[in-house]
Design a protein with these regions (language model features):
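NAD(P)+-binding Rossmann beta1-loop-alpha1 motif at the extreme N-terminus of oxidoreductases
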Residues: 1-45
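Rossmann-like NAD(P)-binding element
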Residues: 44-47, 52-89
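Active-site beta-alpha turn of Rossmann-fold NAD(P)-dependent dehydrogenases/reductases
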Residues: 92
Length: 93
């Protein structure tokens, strides 16, 4: 299954790692791709990074793992058409 994780902090990375260990493809959405360079190298096969828009477009299931104050903006950047009809899990912290 393709999992899109919106948010690249500790929670988002931990969830992404868990889904990767279960054999899923995971894309982590971030505003700063450079921040995830080391994570991507360690995560290995099935892992990728992208913008919030690209991540929401990619995922069959979307995980929202942003800080509370960034959640509304992350959802706007993801694009409502990319979220429509998908399972969305909100673990906002």
């Amino acid at each position: 299954m393709k999992i899109g994780v919106l948010g690249s902090g500790n929670v988002g990375q931990s969830l992404a790692n868990g889904f990767l260990k279960l054999g899923h493809e995971v894309k982590v959405g971030t505003r700063d791709k450079e921040k995830l360079k080391i994570w991507l190298e360690k995560a290995g096969k099935g892992a990728s990074i992208g913008s919030f828009y690209e991540t929401a477009e990619f995922g069959e299931i979307i995980i929202i793992a942003t800080l509370w104050q960034g959640t509304e903006n992350a959802i706007k950047m993801a694009g409502k058409n990319n979220l429509s009809g998908k399972i969305i899990i909100d673990v906002t912290n």
